[in-house]
Amino acid sequence: PHKVMFGWFGNWTGVTMSSSLCGLPDSVDFVSLWLCWGNLTAEQQTDLRKFQEKGSKAVLCWRAGDIGDNLTPGGNATDVKNAFWGIDPNDEDTYIEAAKKYALAIVDTCNKYNVDGFDYDIEDNGTLISSEHPERANTFMRTLREEFNKTGKILVADIPGGKSWLRFYDILAEDVVQSLDYIAWQTYELGHSGLDDFFTGYGGVSSYHPEIFEEVLKKSIVTATFERAIDKHYFSEQQDYHPSCGIEHGGMGAYHIEYDYPGNPDYPTVRAAISAQNPPINN
């Protein structure tokens, strides 16, 4: 099966090739627009449209520990968010309703700008992500899935790639995990053996939702970071990773994929990985 190439794209303006989605190699399947929560400029809208015409997708992406993060008029202060989304700290039902409203606001933004979906970066505790109240995050995700199904949009979760962070994965209900199109794991400093240990070692991904582990691995994207040059080699190591358990993963990606633009040709590291990950079939 085809393995996807993915990236978190930051510093997006759509003005220069290095800050445009259209500057990416054609074989990049989808990107998460890192820290983009709507309000697209004319240049961004044009760039997005051309990128989609090439067959690629782009989704919104941000961290949201709390209900309302980044979409609350007046800012991210807790009392401001609670007031706007109708949360009464003494009434759990108001959290569930607010989680639905927050999901619908994200859907509205995706529809308004013709963005292809949402990548939920799960690494903060708060009023939305809480092991004491898992129903909040699960209601949020189920609402997104239900609405995205109407328009063919994609839903992605991204979670840090260390075993201690799997507590966030554990909050997600099995049906929610099954409903995800992809899970992007932030496995920034892991080579082959580290990835194997993360997925199938003691306390790894396979220890959670074990009944659906095969399905999860098939849609799991392993990633490295281009933010720190010293860690970039992990990306090239991950391009020929094959899980030792014998189940193939979904693909690979990079945090700040746009940092690989400089080169001749441009995106040299990404292009090499695209070829290595899906080698040409010789008949």
Sequence positions of predicted segments:
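Chitinase-like catalytic core of GlcNAc-active glycosidases
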Residues: 2-233, 247-249, 253, 258, ...
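C-terminal helical cap(s) of enzyme catalytic domains, especially alpha/beta-barrels
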Residues: 201, 261-283
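Short, surface-exposed beta-strand/loop micro-motifs that present aromatic residues
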Residues: 237-244
